Design a protein with these regions (language model features):
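N-terminal Rossmann NAD(P)H-binding glycine-rich loop of SDR-like oxidoreductase domains
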Residues: 4-27
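Adenosine-cofactor binding site in Rossmann-like domains, unifying the SAM/SAH pocket
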Residues: 27, 31-50
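Active-site helix of classical SDR
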Residues: 133
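NAD(P)-cofactor binding segment of oxidoreductase domains
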Residues: 74-102
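NAD(P)H-binding glycine-rich loop region in Rossmannoid oxidoreductase-like domains
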Residues: 45-82
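Active-site "gating" loop of Rossmann-like NAD(P)-dependent oxidoreductase/epimerase domains
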Residues: 66-69, 74, 106-127
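NAD(P)-dependent short-chain dehydrogenase/reductase
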Residues: 139-175
Length: 175
């Protein structure tokens, strides 16, 4: 019998967290814990430590994020709290409890000036508050040898505003 792997997914109400919940039942050897902010506020170090003390978690996929790119320019404090400070808290908890963190990030850590697709080894140059906040969170994860996955324009049919729905909306609004 294979060992059951436990994966904590933060940001369970967001687009990526919701989609991971949709497919979780396909994996019999994985026990998923889907954490919304009400279950686990990753900006609260006490809550994080208590949560991790009570169970063994093999992996944590952090999908929790402040993703309102334009609004982040006006609310940088919240963007940095969620995208960097909270990530730093999560990194500490994962490191203490031997949990491997997979931090979900963004292509906004780059300046967009490349004519070819970016590689993970390319220099970063975040221009926006959102990009800078995500880059700082990446730094916390990478310093402790955790993983970072950079995404761009996630899309899904069932979840809120995303690339697919934005393109459909723009296509119907423009001549």
């Amino acid at each position: 019998m294979n060992k059951l792997i436990t994966i904590l997914v933060t940001g369970a109400k967001g687009q990526l967290g919701s989609e991971l919940q949709e497919i979780a039942s396909r994996y019999e050897n994985i026990h998923f814990i889907f954490a919304t902010k009400s279950l686990l506020d990753i900006s609260n170090t006490t809550a994080l430590n208590d949560f991790f003390k009570n169970q063994t978690i093999d992996f944590c996929i952090n999908t929790a994020a402040y993703t309102a790119v334009d609004h982040a320019e006006k609310d940088s404090e919240t963007a940095f709290l969620i995208n960097s400070t909270a990530v730093g808290n999560l990194v500490k908890a994962c490191s203490i409890h031997n949990t491997k963190l997979i931090q979900i990030s963004t292509d906004f850590v780059f300046d967009g000036k490349n004519d070819v697709p970016y590689k993970e080894t390319d220099p970063t140059n975040a221009l926006s508050v959102y990009g800078k906040s995500k880059l700082k969170g990446e730094g916390f994860a990478l310093k402790q040898n955790h993983m970072v996955i950079r995404t761009s324009w996630l899309y899904s049919y069932s979840y809120g505003n995303n690339f697919l729905k934005t393109m459909i909306r723009l296509g119907t609004e423009r001549d």
